[in-house]
Amino acid sequence: MAVIRTTSRDIDLLARLMRAEAEGEGDLGMLMAGNVMVNRVRVGCLDFADINTVERMVFQSPGGFEATQKGYFYQRAREKERRLAQRIVNGERTHPAEFSLWFFRPDGPCPEQWYGQWNSGRYKAHCFFNPTSADCPEVYGVF
């Protein structure tokens, strides 16, 4: 069962963004990036209170994803990436990104906190950050 409402176009957008942000991290890295992306759509907290569609999440400004500013994002999604995106929409979650709303790629080690949000772990080059349950309880809810 889908955890957010999507169209075929949404799956394509999500797949392209997952690839553009995390292709170098392999399938698991793209799935983790996708966890963050879908979490931003499904919660109504912090910087994502008005982000209730995949398209709004993908093109959020300010505070969105840098990959949308690069040409690689605008290349057509491959079927493999579309399947990964559908798995995320269907509710697949992977630690350390299952409750994350942010990730980034630092030059060195992951900081313990990033803009007041706690580090939940690292996968290859990306560090993932979770909101506190006081700031965003719905990200921790069952769906």
Swiss-Prot record:
Keywords: Cell wall biogenesis/degradation, Germination, Hydrolase, Secreted, Sporulation. The keyword Coiled coil does not apply. It is found in: Secreted. GO terms for molecular function: hydrolase activity. GO terms for biological process: cell wall organization; sporulation resulting in formation of a cellular spore. It holds the Pfam family Hydrolase_2. GO terms for cellular component: extracellular region. Belongs to the CwlJ family. Probable spore cortex-lytic enzyme involved in the depolymerization of cortex peptidoglycan during germination. This is Cell wall hydrolase CwlJ. It comes from Halalkalibacterium halodurans (strain ATCC BAA-125 / DSM 18197 / FERM 7344 / JCM 9153 / C-125). The lineage of its organism: Bacteria, Bacillati, Bacillota, Bacilli, Bacillales.
